[in-house]
């Protein structure tokens, strides 16, 4: 009898060959192909799964790029802030008249350390300067750098007040301690804001008077200081150190204090770069009329003890802030002029060297500067 007829008749020609194999007949090449495909259905799927490996790698790299922080931060344009409503004279804010102009100080914003994508975007933005974070931190923490900047702002305010009052010829009352230098004889003896009124029994009315008297001594001498500390009179004796050149050193930076008291309430801003702006605002606030004559004037630059304008950082970003604020004039230290011109556009920028050159620039732009110098002298 024919074996083919003994096999059950299954539907479909392909499965007939499998049935024959099960009954003991030899399998042909076609039979093997059919039965192998049905016994291992995941072979093709395993092959296709390898296609996802490159995609997974890309996803991992994208996540890593967003997570990884570089050593760089972005310096962005900040603001141009008017000082009129922030200044105080003898504890009072001077009244503003309609139409008065203003002196604006300029800021920059420093971001946190950038990730890879932020870094790439900053590279494409002409308004942003990329710098190593250590430029701001000095290798320390951001919090420590922030505290140093706030201290620098306070010192700058006092120097600006002294410079303005000196320019106006106001009567002075002594030498105020601006900075106490660590590791010097003054460190454990004098405090910031101590008012020195006499040195070795000689009355002093200014910082220069005090320095001259100290320099009459030699290293190793005892120097007697008459000090007003928070309204309490004290006599403090300090043994002078050597400044490295054979001259007496006590270890303080001094600033002249005046009968008139001026200050500015600025919160959350650090660094010394508003010094020249504060100096000009103090001069305006202490004298009659509107020095700006309705002009909006942006100013940047450190104010140094001799009244000169010290260079500052971030000037391209500050020029952008001034331009966006639509001010009439921007004053910058001479050393920063080229930096300002790179981003100032149509804004008029004038280089200054000291207080007088800044006032001259304001006068040439239409301000009222006549009769200011020495106007508070007795």
Could you say what each language-model-derived stretch is?
Residues 154-198, 202-205, 308-313, 325:
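PDZ/PDZ-like domain segments forming the peptide/carboxylate-binding groove
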Residues 165, 186, 193-196, 225, ...:
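Terminal peptide-recognition signature
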Residues 1-49, 129-133:
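Terminal targeting segments of Actinobacterial cell-envelope proteins
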Residues 18, 27, 190-191, 217:
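Short, well-ordered loop/turn sites that connect or cap secondary structure elements
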Residues 75-111, 130-181, 237-301:
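PDZ/PDZ-like peptide-tail recognition elements
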Residues 285, 305-332:
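Glycine- and Gly-Pro-enriched alpha-helical subdomains that act as flexible
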Residues 51-69:
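Hydrophobic membrane-insertion alpha-helices, especially the h-region
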Residues 212-254, 341-377:
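PDZ-domain C-terminal substructure recognizer with occasional recognition of PDZ-binding tails
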């Amino acid at each position: 009898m024919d074996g083919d007829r003994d096999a059950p008749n299954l539907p479909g020609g392909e499965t007939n060959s499998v049935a024959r194999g099960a009954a003991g007949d030899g399998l042909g090449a076609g039979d093997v192909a059919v039965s192998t495909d049905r016994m291992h259905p995941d072979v093709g799927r395993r092959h296709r799964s390898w296609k996802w490996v490159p995609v997974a790698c890309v996803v991992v790299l994208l996540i890593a790029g967003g997570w990884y922080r570089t050593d760089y931060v972005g310096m962005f344009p900040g603001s141009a802030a008017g000082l009129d409503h922030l200044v105080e004279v003898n504890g009072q804010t001077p009244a503003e008249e309609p139409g008065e102009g203003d002196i604006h100080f300029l800021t920059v914003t420093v971001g946190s350390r950038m990730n890879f994508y932020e870094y790439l975007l900053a590279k494409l933005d002409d308004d942003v300067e990329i710098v190593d974070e250590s430029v701001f931190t000095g290798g320390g923490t951001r919090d420590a750098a922030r505290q140093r900047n706030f201290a620098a702002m306070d010192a700058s305010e006092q120097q600006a007040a002294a410079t303005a009052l000196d320019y106006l010829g106001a009567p002075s009352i002594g030498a105020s301690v601006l900075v106490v230098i660590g590791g010097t004889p003054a460190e454990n003896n004098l405090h910031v804001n101590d008012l020195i009124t006499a040195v070795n029994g000689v009355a002093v009315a200014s910082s220069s008077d005090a320095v001259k008297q100290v320099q009459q001594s030699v290293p190793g001498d005892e120097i007697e200081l008459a000090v007003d500390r928070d309204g309490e009179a004290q006599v403090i004796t300090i043994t002078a150190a050597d400044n490295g050149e054979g001259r007496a050193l006590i270890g303080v930076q001094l600033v002249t204090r005046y009968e008139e008291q001026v200050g500015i309430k600025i919160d959350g801003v650090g660094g010394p770069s508003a010094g020249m702006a504060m100096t000009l605002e103090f001069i305006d606030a202490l004298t009659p009329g509107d020095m700006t004559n309705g002009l909006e004037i942006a100013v940047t630059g450190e104010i140094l003890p001799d009244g000169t304008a010290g260079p500052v950082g971030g000037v391209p970003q500050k020029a952008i802030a001034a331009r966006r604020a639509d001010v009439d004039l921007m004053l910058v230290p001479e050393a920063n002029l080229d930096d300002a011109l790179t981003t100032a556009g149509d804004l008029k920028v004038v280089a200054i060297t000291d207080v007088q050159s800044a006032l001259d620039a304001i006068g040439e732009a239409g301000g009222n500067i006549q009769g200011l110098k020495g106007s508070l002298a007795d």
